[in-house]
Amino acid sequence: LAVEAATFHTPYLIENYSDYGDFCKNRLLSAFAFNGEDFVKAQKIRQTIRSKWNHFLKDFDLLVTHSQPEKTPLLDKPSSTRFMNSFNILGWPAISIPMGKDKDALPLGIQLVAKPWQEELLLRAAQTIESYS
């Protein structure tokens, strides 16, 4: 995904480099270290992962996970995307929704994940859960 994101953002990075935060710039720029062969290998690995997840979740409509691996990140500190990356790679629709607050009154969230082309189910479930929190 990094190569795809960097390819998309290249013209904007050139014209508006200072508009990007350091975290985002570093992430996008690191993607330029990959070549075409790396990209093709990554696509093959992506397809293998997709097949395994499709098999693993064949009997489930939705998956519920944490949104973050730790407490709510501060605004000036980027958070980990560890729990989101897998589903971005798969191309599966996912949404993070608020789910109460921690002991410091900071918001907590959960991530809902649906199978491909199940965005309507995902959004209905998210709306229902959010209406109770």
Model-based region annotation:
Residues F34-K44, S51, I89-S133:
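Structural helix-boundary/capping segments
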Residues E4, R82, L121-R124:
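Generic recognition of stable, solvent-exposed alpha-helical segments in well-folded globular domains
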Residues L1-E4, V113-A114:
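Short, hinge-like loop/turn segments at secondary-structure boundaries
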Residues A6-L90:
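Serine-dependent amide/ester hydrolase catalytic core
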